[in-house]
């Protein structure tokens, strides 16, 4: 019996495999699509772990000493995780709102701001001189507040005369201070874009310059006064980002019971501005927290506040924020 030499031979096909280029491209595309989905899921997981605040832009109206209520509103928004001061993109402030806005931009926490207000002897930040009224059109030069602003700037930036460009480079927050030019009748928006080399301290001093009380600021022969006169609520600056913007408006009640000259004086000013601001307030109602309540002993030129009164203003701010949250979120 003859054994064939081929019985135990294994034949191997060593020819090159063939691939369809179109199929390979499709497979690569599918892999990339799956990879993108994985990345998206990962991002969603991270976002859930690190919750983003709803609002990153903040608008703060004027309101004189009643601006303390802003702090209560902000505290409530932070507690509800609607706002995070460490993640702000932009802050626009007028008058008292400009002062508070500066503290926020400089990185103060809401607790630090509240402690600052409680420890501040408000009656010592003004030194009225009624002999100035005829010569300077005001009774208070605002020097004490101006020096306070520069001390605060120095403590956080090491630069007393810091300008808007420098402040933006340090903080990354778009800070806008609103002023009014009495000479040209123009509203002025001080920020790192429009006025990059303008001193922040001067802009805030201009913005808090309540007519009739603080003397106007003269720059180059032009007079500058309180930003609230021409735009007390600059929500218009964020018209394209309303979904990310929240504003706080300190409302003046329009009544006919004038106990002080200051109330009578402000009622006249409010009468001139009433129609304009009524329209503005309603236009941005969905983005506005209205603070309507104030203690009876608080009026615009009264800087002598005890801590009990400050606390009431703070609590009225919290109440206003609670009402806003209830109407906007809880009822949906």
Swiss-Prot record:
Subcellular location field: Membrane
Motif stretch (GXSXG): 93-97
Lineage summary: Viruses, Varidnaviria, Bamfordvirae, Nucleocytoviricota, Megaviricetes
The name this protein goes by in its record: Uncharacterized protein L446
Keywords noted in UniProt: Glycoprotein, Hydrolase, Lipid degradation, Lipid metabolism, Membrane, Transmembrane, Transmembrane helix
InterPro entries: Acyl_Trfase/lysoPLipase, Lipid_Hydrolase, PNPLA_dom
Enzyme superclass (EC): hydrolase
Motif (DGA/G): 226-228
Residues annotated as transmembrane: 90-110
Residue ranges of every copy of the PNPLA domain listed in the record: 58-239
Residues bearing glycans: 2, 13, 307
Function: Probable lipid hydrolase.
An annotated GO cellular component: membrane
GO MF annotation: an example: hydrolase activity
Membrane topology per record: Single-pass membrane protein
Active-site residues, as the UniProt record annotates them: 95 (nucleophile), 226 (proton acceptor)
Short name of any one Pfam family annotated for the protein: Patatin
One example of a Gene Ontology biological process annotation: lipid catabolic process
Its EC number(s): 3.1.1.-
PROSITE patterns: PNPLA
């Amino acid at each position: 019996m003859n054994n064939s030499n081929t019985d135990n031979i294994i034949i191997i096909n060593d020819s090159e495999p063939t691939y369809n280029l179109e199929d390979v491209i499709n497979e690569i595309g599918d892999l990339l699509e799956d990879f993108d989905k994985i990345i998206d899921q990962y991002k969603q997981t991270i976002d859930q772990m690190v919750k983003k605040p709803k609002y990153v832009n903040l608008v703060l109206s004027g309101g004189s000493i009643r601006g303390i209520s802003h702090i209560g509103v902000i505290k409530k928004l932070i507690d509800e995780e609607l706002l995070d001061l460490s993640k702000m993109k932009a802050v626009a402030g007028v008058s008292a709102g400009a002062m508070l806005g500066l503290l926020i931009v400089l990185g103060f926490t809401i607790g630090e701001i509240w402690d600052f207000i409680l420890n501040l002897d408000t009656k010592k930040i003004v030194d009225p001189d009624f002999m100035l009224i005829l010569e300077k059109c005001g009774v208070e030069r605002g020097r004490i507040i101006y020096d306070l602003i520069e001390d605060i700037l120095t403590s956080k930036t090491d630069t007393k005369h810091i300008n808007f460009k420098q402040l933006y480079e340090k903080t990354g927050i778009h800070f806008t201070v609103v002023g009014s030019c009495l000479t040209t009748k123009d509203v002025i928006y001080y920020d790192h874009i429009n006025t990059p080399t303008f001193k922040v301290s001067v802009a805030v001093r201009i913005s808090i310059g309540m007519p009739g009380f603080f003397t106007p600021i003269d720059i180059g022969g032009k007079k500058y006064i309180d930003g609230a006169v021409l735009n007390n609520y600059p929500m218009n600056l964020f018209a394209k980002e309303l979904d990310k913007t929240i504003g706080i408006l300190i409302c003046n009640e329009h009544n006919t019971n004038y106990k002080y000259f200051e109330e009578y004086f402000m009622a006249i000013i409010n009468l001139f501005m009433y129609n304009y601001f009524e329209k503005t307030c309603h236009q941005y109602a969905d983005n506005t927290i209205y603070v309507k309540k104030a203690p009876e002993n608080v009026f615009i030129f009264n800087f002598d506040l005890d801590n009990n009164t400050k606390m009431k203003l703070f609590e009225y701010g919290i109440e206003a924020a609670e009402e806003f949250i209830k109407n906007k979120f809880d009822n949906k």
